[in-house]
Structure formats: C-alpha cells, structure tokens
Design a protein with these regions (language model features):
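Extracytoplasmic/periplasmic cell wall- or extracellular glycan-interacting regions that localize
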Residues: 1-98, 103, 108-111, 117-119, ...
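A residue-level detector for short acidic-glycine micro-motifs
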Residues: 63, 87, 103, 129-132, ...
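Short hydrophobic beta/alpha edge segments that flank linear recognition/processing sites
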Residues: 85, 114-116, 142-155
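A structural signal for short beta-strand/turn segments enriched in small hydrophobics and glycine
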Residues: 93, 99-101, 138-150
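Short histidine-centered loop motifs in beta-beta connectors
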Residues: 104, 120-140, 144
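Hydrophobic alpha-helix feature that most strongly marks membrane-spanning transmembrane helices
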Residues: 106, 135, 146-155, 178
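A beta-hairpin/wing motif
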Residues: 157-164
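Short proline/glycine- and basic residue-enriched helix-capping loop/turn segments at helix->loop/beta transitions
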Residues: 167
Length: 178
C-alpha cells in the first residue's frame, strides 16, 4: 500500500484532499487566484498565439513539445515537456508576459545552470539552462524583460528549454508563441 501511495504521488494521481469548508468529492483548485491574478490569467489566455519568443535574437527550435524520436537511434524517443530553442552566444532568455518570479533553481546536474519560473496568474512559464541571472525570486517582471543569459550546453550550443503550464497541466509552447 505504501508503494502504491508513493507511485500515485509521483504520477500526480493522489485523490484530492478535503477540508471542513469543502464538500467531499469537490476538488480543491491547485492555485487560489486573487482578483489581480484572475485578470492576469485572462489576459495571458487572450494572448495565446501572440506571446513573444522567449529568446533574444535569431533562434531555431531544435526539439518540439511531445514525443520526439532521437535521430540515428532506432526506436528511441523522448517526451519533451517544452520546446528546446537554440540561440547564439550572449543571447538572453526573456519573459513572455508580465508576472512574478515564483522560483529559481540551480540545475541539480549542471553546475551554474539555472531554471527560472514565472507565475502569470494560473499560468507558469519556465526557462531552463540560464546563467548570469538578472532576476530574483519574488521580483515582478514585464513582458520581454531579460531574465539571464542562455548557457552553452554540452555540445557548445546556446540552447534553452522553455515550458508553459496552466496550474499543473503542461501546455505546448509553440501554440502560444506568435
């Protein structure tokens, strides 16, 4: 039973919890929005297909959202939770919309590589493989504001992974970028 509970937790399939104010069987929202957050969420939603590319300068999408087959390796596939965007030396990640920096993490396996997460009401944008950060947790950011430099990856390419979520639901970023 403990193993089963742990698997449900990892897979995000735990049943919703209840409180005294909540009737049994009524799921709690993942994020409680203030009036300002609701307005921001609505504004973010209305910009679907028109958000700026989250990288400065020329770019190339090198890996798309969803299942991707690895070139040269038969039957090997990777599930990409975002898009991988290659830029040039000194290119920067930039905020795709107004929001608040909700978290900053150092990548556990790549020293000096950071992940920046920005909350836009119910929506979250995440920017992976950054260095020389220009923002701090809790800071408000504006659309197109620089977040940090994109770090060279192990191949020497300046590649950033960009992800979008609505609460816990993963979204295809290519459907949101204009």
């Amino acid at each position: 039973a403990a193993q089963e509970a742990e698997m449900r937790k990892k897979n995000g399939s735990d049943p919703p919890t209840t409180t005294k104010e909540q009737k049994a069987g009524t799921p709690m929202p993942a994020y409680r929005e203030s009036a300002a957050d609701k307005k921001l969420s609505g504004s973010f939603q209305s910009n679907k297909g028109h958000l700026p590319v989250p990288i400065t300068g020329p770019y190339l999408i090198t890996s798309h959202y969803g299942i991707n087959y690895v070139e040269g390796l038969k039957n090997v596939k990777i599930n990409n939770h975002g898009v991988d965007i290659r830029g040039h030396m000194n290119c920067q990640a930039r905020a795709v919309f107004d929001g608040t920096v909700s978290a900053i993490f150092e990548h556990p396996q790549i020293q000096g590589s950071y992940i920046v997460m920005i909350r836009h009401g119910q929506y979250i944008s995440a920017y992976f493989n950054l260095s020389e950060l220009k923002v701090k947790k809790g800071e408000k950011v504006k659309i197109n504001e620089p977040l940090g430099l994109i770090k060279a990856d192990m191949s020497g390419n300046y590649t950033m992974q960009f992800q979008l979520r609505r609460d816990r639901e993963r979204l295809n970023p290519e459907q949101w970028i204009g």
